[in-house]
Amino acid sequence: MKPELLRIFGVINGALIAALVLIAGSEAYLRLTIPASSGESIYRYTLETRRYKVMKPNVAVSAWGKELRTNELGFRDNSAAIPPKQPDEFRIIVLGSSFTVSAGVDYADIYTSRLEQQLRKIDPKVKVINLAVGGYNPLQYELVLKEVGLSLDPDMVLVALFPDSDFRLDIYEENRRVAEGKAPEARPSAWDEHLYTYRAYGRRIADKVKSILVRPSGQSSDFQARRAWLENTAALQRIAQTARERKLPLAVAVLPHTFNFIRQREEFGRIQRFCREQQLPCLNLLESFIARQVPEGQLRLNVLDSHPNEKYNAIVANVLTSELGPVLPALKDRDSDWASAATVRRAEFQR
């Protein structure tokens, strides 16, 4: 073999060895610094409800080293059951998805728990109940409200909207297929999915390349997106109507993802217009995060999981407390203009 070819092969082999050493070192570092999860699924798929996917009741799993426990109703809690409503208790139920479940964060540090703690400094009788389930959209929020929430005798409904995935139907329809036995509950993972290094860095590169090479199919994709928007916004309107009929104050907190705050403004603007048209009480938390200038990377659980950490939850709780705290006395009076109005006046979009 010619010397030039030998040198080329030597350079290639050296680069491959260096890459393998780098990957191995990165893998070891990530596994040493990121707590493991227990791995078992907390979900059950069922045709007993049109939610199709529910969390198993009275179970505990570990998410990134933090316990996630459910109560007898199948919602995140640190108690086995939601206690009976006490005299003069002001009960807030929170509907939402994975950013409200907040797996990977201690129960005491998720924003619903923090909100309860902070509002109790104003009124010790406040109780905040987390009724969120990962992967849900407004269609399922509505079902949770009607199937579970109203039976808990709430005094207020708080919807935690997550624009990044709330106006889609693909996850919901996949849940239905699994419940019907037409799709597997968990798809087998490729070998590289077990590597922390790939999940932290390689997947993003692969997704970026895929987004460039694979374009959605024009009219069909537009139709599906429009259908998803209409069905989920209609569900929000029905939630608002139910709240009005029950004379329950309603607030909609719109939560940002932990990536690309500025790019999210377009979608938040669309939701802002919808809220104003429908007179829905929406609070734009994206602007609250941008104003605080906290680096987005400091709000994620870790490099493998972009779900919110303790700092993100603390910001959400602080914003909600600043909006709801001053008007808590009016919220408690169902005969006041506040309780019967279509909007929560302090919880409107400011931008």
Q: Regions from the language model: what does each represent?
A:
Residues 113, 117, 143, 234-237, ...:
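Solvent-exposed, polar/charged alpha-helical surfaces in well-ordered, non-transmembrane soluble domains
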Residues 162-280, 285-298, 302, 334-351:
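Serine-dependent acyl-ester chemistry module
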Residues 67-69, 91-93, 99-185:
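Conserved SGNH/GDSL esterase-like catalytic core that processes O-acyl groups on lipids
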Residues 34-123, 289-293, 299-303, 351:
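Membrane/wall-proximal cationic-aromatic binding patches
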Residues 11-27:
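Hydrophobic membrane-insertion alpha-helices, especially the h-region
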Residues 14, 301-345:
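Histidine-centered active-site loop/cap adjacent to the catalytic His
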Residues 27, 97, 141, 157, ...:
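Generic structural signal for small/hydrophobic residues in well-ordered secondary structure
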Residues 89-90, 124-126, 152-157, 244-251, ...:
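Loop/turn elements at helix/coil->beta-strand transitions in domains of secreted/extracellular proteins
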